[in-house]
From Swiss-Prot:
Chain's gene name: prsA
Protein name stated in the entry: Foldase protein PrsA
Membrane topology qualifier: Lipid-anchor
GO biological process: protein folding
Gene3D superfamilies linked to this entry: 3.10.50.40, Porin chaperone SurA, peptide-binding domain
Organism: Clostridium perfringens (strain ATCC 13124 / DSM 756 / JCM 1290 / NCIMB 6125 / NCTC 8237 / Type A)
GO CC entries: plasma membrane
GO molecular function: peptidyl-prolyl cis-trans isomerase activity
Length: 342
């Protein structure tokens, strides 16, 4: 399960105003430091206090390791500066995407947002179990402020889906990539070519399995239907895992146990892991060093190229939007309260 810290690092959003910075060479009150403008988006300010509100866990860790005057340590100060730079870029991205969601008319309704926020929150909480509250507290979030993080993720995802909706990868693109990168598609170990479908819940997985068994659809049809979902961060996910060795595959044990008895072309019943419910398909067996045929890795290549094209399209649109919204980031202001070595 993804940790709260990782989710917070990917989202980089929130509303809680908190600061734990010290004084620098120029005497300023803490309130003045917190109000320092470190970026603007369409004239709207982002303050250092907003940035530091996402670093409470970092500050607590630094204080525990280096003592109360941790910000006076140039090495620690440099680490905090890097964290601030990462956070402010995330906050800028969130504001830009929020503005564009409204402009494009693609912002989900409040009801849709609440439903998705509640679902994701409960999934994260359930996945982390007893560690959730402690992890949330360690990162400086309450349940409400963490839900604000997820809310921004939901809005951002809507814009990202809009940006990449027309991105396509053709069979010709995939063939060209294969021909130019054949060395990437050599079996690193002896094992079974493995694909799987990953569903959010047991009901969806069982329905898909039953439809495959009844002949209403096929595993390959569903794989094609869902193969772009991974890049769009939504389930069901269709994924080609390549050649999976019998030992030391790095996969969770439940998945390995589900794959083991399958013969070529067979599929498993829905298998529960910490990630959801899988339907696994076993493909051909390959020896270490064997060149994998194009048809066996085509779906894998399409996913690689789709992710590349999605990233390029997203970056191009974001760069233009930042220009249109006159985004400015004041890197020097991110050094407030820190003793940075020159």
């Amino acid at each position: 399960m993804v940790s709260v810290k990782k989710i917070v690092a990917s989202a980089l959003v929130g509303v809680l105003m908190f600061s734990a910075v010290g004084c620098n060479m120029v005497e300023k009150t803490q309130a003045a430091i917190d109000k320092t403008t470190v970026a603007t988006v369409n004239g709207e300010k982002i303050t250092l206090g907003e940035v530091d509100s996402h670093l409470k866990g970092v500050f607590a860790q630094m204080k525990s390791q280096y003592g109360d005057k941790y910000m006076d340590d140039p090495q620690v100060a440099q680490q905090i500066l890097q964290q601030r730079q990462s956070v402010v870029q995330g906050l800028v991205t969130d504001k830009v995407l929020g503005i564009e969601a409204d402009k494009l008319g693609i912002k989900p309704s409040e009801e849709e947002i609440k439903k998705k926020v509640d679902e994701q929150f409960e999934n994260i909480k359930k996945g982390m179990g007893d560690n959730f509250d402690k992890a949330l507290e360690a990162e400086g979030y309450t349940e409400d402020t963490f839900k604000d993080v997820i809310k921004n993720q939901v809005i951002n995802q809507a814009v990202q889906d809009y940006i990449i909706k027309d991105v396509k990868v053709t069979d010709e693109d995939a063939q060209k990539y294969y021909d130019e990168n054949k060395q990437q598609f050599v079996a690193k170990d002896s094992g079974v070519l493995t694909k799987h479908l990953l569903f959010e819940n047991e009901e969806e997985a069982q329905k898909a399995y039953d439809e495959i068994q009844s002949g209403k659809t096929t595993f390959n049809d569903l794989f094609t239907k869902y193969e772009n979902n991974k890049s769009e961060n939504k389930k069901p996910i269709a994924e080609n895992l390549g050649v999976v060795p019998a030992e030391n595959s790095g996969l969770v044990q439940e998945f390995v146990d589900g794959l083991k008895p399958l013969k070529e072309g067979e599929i498993s019943k829905p298998i529960k892991t910490q990630f959801g419910y899988h339907i696994i398909q076993a493909g051909a067996t390959y020896e270490k060093g064997a060149q994998l045929p194009f048809d066996d890795v085509k779906s894998q290549i399409i996913q690689i190229l789709k992710q590349q094209k999605d990233s390029e399209k997203f970056k191009a649109d974001m760069d233009q939007w930042k220009k249109d919204l006159n985004v400015k980031v004041y890197d020097d202001k991110l050094q407030e309260g820190l003793k940075i070595s020159k």
